């Protein structure tokens, strides 16, 4: 009976799977730490931005000599809080990107585990 697989690669598969699994676990651990930090930063920048936004909005309304429309108020507040809004968007994007990287690493880990399980069930 002819073997359909490369015997040399087949012999090294358990070690490759173990190395792949350990590598992905390390990556996931790093990403979890990074995601926690990104989550905290995103929460702080969001809270800061929203608090400043509310404060500025009240100040604009209180200091208005004539009644302003809501779009005019929002435009004035937005122009004063550009930096804070940008910091909030960047922090939010970092959190999203880190979360996606974590999901990708978890998928790779699942693939390595599936490969190892397939090898074991095939009698390897």
Set out the residue ranges of the language-model regions:
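Short acidic DE-rich linear segments
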Residues: 2-3, 121-124
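Long amphipathic alpha-helical coiled-coil segments
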Residues: 39-42, 46, 86-119
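Short, glycine/alanine-rich amphipathic alpha-helical segment
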Residues: 63-93
């Amino acid at each position: 009976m002819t073997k359909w697989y490369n015997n040399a690669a087949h012999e090294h598969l358990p070690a490759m799977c173990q190395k792949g699994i350990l590598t992905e676990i390390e990556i996931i651990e790093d990403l979890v730490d990074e995601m926690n930090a990104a989550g905290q930063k995103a929460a702080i920048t969001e809270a800061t931005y929203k608090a400043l936004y509310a404060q500025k909005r009240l100040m604009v309304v209180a200091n208005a000599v004539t009644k302003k429309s809501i779009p005019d108020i929002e435009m004035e507040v937005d122009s004063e809080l550009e930096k804070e809004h940008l910091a909030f968007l960047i922090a939010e994007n970092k959190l999203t990107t880190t979360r996606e990287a974590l999901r990708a690493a978890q998928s790779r880990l699942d693939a390595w585990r599936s490969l190892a399980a397939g090898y074991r069930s095939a009698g390897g």
